[in-house]
Curated annotation (Swiss-Prot):
Keywords assigned: Stress response
Descriptive protein name: Heat shock protein 30C
A cellular-component GO term for this protein: nucleus
Gene symbol of the encoding locus: hsp30c
InterPro entries (alphabetical): A-crystallin/Hsp20_dom, Alpha-crystallin/sHSP_animal, HSP20-like_chaperone
Ranges where the record places region Disordered: 61-93, 174-213
Entry similarity comment: Belongs to the small heat shock protein (HSP20) family.
Organism for this UniProt entry: Xenopus laevis
Biological processes, Gene Ontology terms: protein refolding; response to heat
Superkingdom, taxonomy of origin: Eukaryota
Length: 213
């Protein structure tokens, strides 16, 4: 048999060191881990920003819709009869009808000031959004009407219908008939011809009379 030294390969390893060689895999894995964390953080931040943008758009759309409804209601109130409406013949009672459907009963105030009826409505609502923002809504409305002389301000009453119409009514006072009063006729002592002449003619006549004298 041949000795073992003869069957061994004649070449030896290039690096006969006993320590394992370093590779790039652990460092690459660490870099990818940090990159993944950064991407997740950026995605979460973008989602939060998108939620805020969506909430702002929702509030803006809601505010725009409420403004549109308010404008439509104001135009409808102006087109409707907001002036006093009398009864059948206008002699029995005084009536004023107002459209107040945008306000609840506890937001309305009706009062008389002298011979004027004043109706005011105030609406206020505060709310917090999901992202911590603050929403404040405020509306104020006012109408005034002059009471006729035949209406006693202390007898004014009002009622609110289901369709949002405020009815203000008051009975008309029964005025006593005017008494029969004779009117005297005054007599004018000036000559009728002098009244019919113009002022220049009267002056010239007066000067002629002085020359004759």
């Amino acid at each position: 048999m041949f000795p073992l030294s003869l069957v061994q390969p004649s070449h030896s390893p290039l690096c006969p060191c006993s320590q394992p060689a370093l590779t790039l895999w652990p460092a690459t894995r660490l870099i990818f881990g940090h990159l993944e964390d950064d991407i997740l953080s950026m995605r979460n931040d973008m989602e939060r920003r998108m939620q805020r943008v969506n909430e702002a758009c929702r509030l803006l759309s809601k505010d725009t819709e409420m403004r549109r409804i308010t404008d439509q209601n104001r135009q409808s109130r102006e087109s409707e009869g907001t002036s006093p409406n009398s009864g059948k013949d206008g002699k029995d009672h005084f009536e004023l009808t107002l459209n107040v459907r945008d306000f609840s009963p506890h937001e309305l105030t009706v009062k008389t000031q002298g011979r004027r009826v004043i109706v005011t409505g105030k609406h206020e609502r505060k709310s917090d959004t999901e992202d911590g923002n603050y929403f404040h809504e405020y509306r104020e409305w006012k109408r005034e009407a002059e009471l006729p002389e035949s209406v006693n301000p202390e007898q004014v009453v009002c009622s609110l219908s289901k369709n949002g119409h405020l009815h203000i009514q008051a009975p008309r006072l029964a005025l006593p008939p005017a008494p029969e009063t004779p009117i005297p006729i005054s007599m004018d002592t000036a000559p009728r011809d002098a009244q019919e002449l113009p002022p220049d003619a009267q002056t010239s006549n007066a000067e002629g009379d002085q020359k004759v004298d």
